[in-house]
């Protein structure tokens, strides 16, 4: 019923009184009732359903002219009274929110009064239809009352939503204040105290902003919120080490500049969260979080890209096709749009890394577009010929734009593939670190210069990827990958210079290591969005991480007949698991990287199982952050059980593979790792099935399960690496298919369905792949 649905859903807006704050939210516009969150939309669905039933009842009666049955009349009357009762409870919640938030009190009282009157009006109209079936109640009156009711209820919900927005902004204000205190602190003891408070405030903001992110309807805003939250999480670690380095070496200019740069990036992330929760409308002063105006707009979704320019041109051409005319205003706009596209493609043609033949192809496509544009905008004296030729010209220009878009995509993806395949980051950063520790200033300067050039190349590649992004989410993600690299590169160099000045400083070394790790995360982000962009551009559905929904349902087809009551861990427990969860995430990245090496040969069972296990471990890592598809401890345990089953299957697959490996040191290493897998699987399965009572015991079980999963994942990473070494050294390749169960002379092969592995002659391995093979696997060369 509408009553129960609305009362339960609106209860989420109930909030306790909060202290006054200077947070300012956008002013409420009663004429703009656009719904931007899923919760408001879901709250309105039951009410819309009931109102639709009432209107349809009246319409069907007027169409047939026959009195309805008593059952139908009672149902309609019951709906009217239920809607009125639900609105009354709904209004009571709204008035409670108004009492606790003085800034929205007048508007909320007014909206509640309006909703109460509209609910009573709907109930009266429903009674009128049932008391006297022959009475004439105009449908327009009923529709008008329905609109008034929906409008007033939506207004109450939007006002309540302002309270949630204000809570996020207040949490940001607390962090901004703590950042200013951290920035002015000169004592290490004071810094530790303030940072402890700052950490608690970050947890509060993470939960409030996370709830808001999941509630947003706009994919663009959700992507921006996700990026801002991830940036804050990474920057917090950088802030800790950079501040400790500066406090240890207060006279070091590079340490001060590095710390100040991290502070500035954190304030930019806070500003981006504020933009997301306020939907781009900020009434706060510009200096609220950042003093200086940034070089680029914070809302990166406003930036124009080559793909966006092509899309604008395509929409204009479609309008011309429909109207069959090109007016003076349209002519000016379409020429301006083509000029903008030509300017944006200069990032491709001016790049030193773009091959000459690809540069010429892009310029040729642009020249063809200009030629077709000239034919389109030139007036023709013969109107009949103009009308017949216009559609042909529009079709030709559309085809040229598609060809240009495809060529830009090829150029961008090839450059990204090359830079990721080279993998220069680790070599440069480790060399710079080694020179800094040894006090080799010349060596540090040398590798700093190389890293600076490499970082510029990475940013240029990111810019090309940004140009070819075709969805709102990818547009945001690719733009912020470039921005993060542009901000992180000079800070990493400053951290290296600090270590060079103080080579014996442990905290300076730790600071550089953290910056290097963060740069590696940025490179992983680039790899991920590059693959997603390639998938989206080719019209394929992006492969999601293997989610919990793929697991067997407990009780019906699963392994646990009586699942324990799901328990959701609180913030403190999640914080305790964050460290081991992060370690497991790093292992998933390592397994993914090792699995990607096999793409040169074939997509075999080892690769598939490694990627599947990496996906499941990643979901368990997200659980330690309070995110992802695993919502309760029961979900986690079921996922861990399935993870152990996958590990057992991996064991059988690699064992079959090991039969083709000749006796050697490599086979001994592989066998030694392989023997440890069943033990870890058994331990994990025992932990999952062990009963627990109480929250403390459950947390202990969760901690043990995640720790054992991490240990098993570590062995899987070693196993994949050892298998790859054997496959490449002894030229063993996967042929596909399955074989019937059989037992060899040694009695080892007993699997019913096994991977077919065969030794490959060296001459075949050395043969270069054909061009068709290269083109078919162009997208698979992007490493994650």
UniProtKB/Swiss-Prot annotation:
Keywords: Coiled coil, Cytoplasm. GO terms for cellular component: plasma membrane; striated muscle dense body. Residues 387-414 form a coiled coil. Residues 35-247 are annotated as: Vinculin/alpha-catenin homology 1 (VH1) region. The keyword Coiled coil applies. Residues 771-784 have a biased composition (Low complexity). Residues 745-756 have a biased composition (Basic and acidic residues). One of its GO terms (molecular function) is cadherin binding. GO terms for biological process: cell adhesion; regulation of locomotion; Rho protein signal transduction. Residues 552-696 are annotated as: Vinculin/alpha-catenin homology 2 (VH2) region. Its main location: cytoplasm. Expressed in body wall muscles, vulval muscles, stomatointestinal cells and pharyngeal muscle cells. Expressed in enteric muscles, nerve ring neurons and in the ventral nerve cord. Pfam families: Vinculin. It is found in: Cytoplasm. Disulfide bonds: none annotated. Required for slo-1 potassium ion channel clustering at presynaptic terminals and in egg-laying muscles; clustering of slo-1 mediates the intoxicating and sedatory effects of ethanol on worms. Required for slo-1 localization to dense bodies in body wall muscle cells. Maintains the localization of the dystrophin complex near muscle cell dense bodies via its interaction with complex member dyb-1 which is required for slo-1 localization in muscle while slo-1 localization in neurons is independent of the dystrophin complex. The vinculin/alpha-catenin homology 1 (VH1) region plays a critical role in interacting with dyb-1 and mediates the localization of ctn-1 near dense bodies. The vinculin/alpha-catenin homology 2 (VH2) region may play a role in the precise localization of ctn-1 near dense bodies. Belongs to the vinculin/alpha-catenin family. This is Alpha-catulin. It comes from Caenorhabditis elegans.
């Amino acid at each position: 019923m509408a009553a129960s649905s609305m009362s339960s859903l609106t209860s989420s807006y109930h909030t306790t009184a909060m202290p006054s704050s200077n947070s300012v939210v956008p002013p409420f516009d009663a004429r703009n009732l656009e719904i931007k969150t899923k919760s408001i939309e879901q709250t309105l669905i039951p009410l819309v359903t009931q109102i639709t039933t009432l209107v349809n009842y009246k319409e069907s009666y007027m169409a047939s002219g026959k009195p309805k049955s008593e059952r139908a009349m009672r149902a309609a009357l019951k709906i009217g009274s239920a809607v009125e009762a639900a609105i009354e409870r709904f209004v009571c919640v709204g008035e409670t929110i108004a009492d606790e938030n003085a800034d929205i009190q007048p508007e909320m009282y007014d909206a509640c009064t309006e909703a109460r009157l509209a609910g009573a009006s709907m109930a009266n109209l429903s009674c009128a239809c049932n008391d006297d079936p022959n009475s004439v109640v105009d449908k327009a009156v009923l529709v008008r009352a329905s609109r008034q009711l929906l409008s007033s209820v939506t207004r109450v919900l939007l006002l309540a939503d302002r309270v949630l927005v204000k809570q996020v902004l207040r949490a940001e204000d607390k962090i901004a204040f703590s950042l200013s205190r951290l920035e002015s602190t000169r004592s290490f003891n004071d810094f530790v105290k303030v940072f402890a408070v700052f950490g608690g405030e970050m947890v509060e903001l993470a939960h409030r902003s996370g709830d808001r992110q999941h509630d947003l309807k706009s994919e663009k805003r959700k992507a921006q919120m996700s990026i801002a939250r991830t940036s804050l999480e990474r920057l917090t670690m950088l802030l800790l080490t950079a501040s400790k380095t500066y406090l240890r070496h207060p006279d070091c200019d590079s340490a001060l500049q590095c710390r100040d740069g991290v502070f500035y990036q954190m304030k930019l992330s806070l500003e981006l969260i504020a933009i997301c929760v306020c939907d781009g409308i900020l009434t706060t002063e510009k200096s609220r979080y950042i003093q200086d105006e940034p070089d680029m707009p914070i809302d990166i979704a406003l930036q124009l890209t080559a793909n966006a320019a092509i899309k604008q041109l395509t929409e204009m051409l479609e309008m011309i096709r429909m109207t069959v005319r090109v007016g003076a205003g349209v002519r000016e706009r379409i020429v301006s749009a083509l000029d903008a596209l030509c300017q944006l493609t200069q990032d491709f043609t001016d790049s030193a890394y773009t091959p000459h033949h690809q540069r010429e192809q892009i310029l040729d496509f642009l020249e063809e577009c200009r030629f077709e544009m000239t034919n389109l905008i030139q007036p023709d004296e013969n109107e009949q010929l103009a009308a017949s030729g216009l559609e042909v010209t529009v079709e030709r220009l559309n085809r040229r734009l598609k060809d240009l878009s495809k060529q830009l995509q090829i150029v961008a993806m090839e450059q990204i593939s090359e830079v990721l395949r080279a993998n220069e980051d680790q070599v440069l950063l480790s060399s710079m670190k080694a020179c800094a520790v040894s006090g080799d200033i010349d060596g540090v300067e040398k590798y700093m210069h190389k890293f600076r050039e490499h970082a510029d190349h990475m940013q240029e590649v990111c810019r090309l990827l940004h140009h070819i992004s075709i969805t709102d989410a990818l547009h945001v993600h690719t733009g912020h990958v470039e921005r993060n690299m542009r901000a992180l590169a000079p800070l990493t160099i400053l951290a290296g210079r600090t270590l060079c000045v103080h080579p014996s400083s442990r905290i300076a070394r730790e600071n550089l290591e953290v910056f290097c790790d963060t740069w590696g995360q940025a490179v992983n982000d680039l790899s991920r969005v590059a693959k997603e962009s390639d998938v989206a551009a080719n019209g394929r559905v992006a492969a999601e991480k293997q989610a919990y929904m793929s697991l067997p349902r407990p009780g019906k087809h699963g392994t646990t007949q009586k699942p324990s009551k799901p328990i959701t861990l609180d913030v403190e427990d999640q914080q305790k698991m964050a460290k081991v969860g992060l370690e497991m995430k790093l292992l998933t990245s390592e397994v993914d990287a090792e699995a990607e090496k096999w793409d040169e040969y074939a997509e075999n069972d080892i690769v598939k199982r490694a990627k599947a296990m990496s996906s499941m471990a990643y979901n368990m890592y997200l659980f330690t952050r309070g995110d992802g598809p695993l919502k309760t401890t029961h979900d986690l345990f079921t996922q861990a059980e399935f993870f152990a089953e996958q590990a057992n299957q991996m064991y059988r697959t690699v064992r079959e593979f090991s039969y083709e490996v000749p006796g050697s040191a490599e086979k001994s290493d592989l066998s030694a790792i392989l023997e440890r897998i069943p033990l870890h699987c058994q331990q994990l399965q025992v932990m999952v099935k062990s009963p627990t009572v109480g929250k403390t015991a459950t947390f202990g079980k969760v901690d043990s399960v995640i720790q054992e999963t991490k240990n098993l994942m570590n062995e899987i990473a070693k196993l994949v690496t050892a298998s790859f070494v054997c496959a490449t050294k002894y030229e063993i390749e996967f042929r596909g298919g399955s074989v019937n169960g059989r037992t060899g002379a040694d009695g080892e092969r007993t699997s019913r369905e096994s991977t077919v592995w065969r030794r490959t002659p060296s001459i075949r391995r050395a043969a270069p792949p054909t061009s068709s093979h290269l083109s078919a696997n162009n997208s698979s060369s992007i490493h994650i």
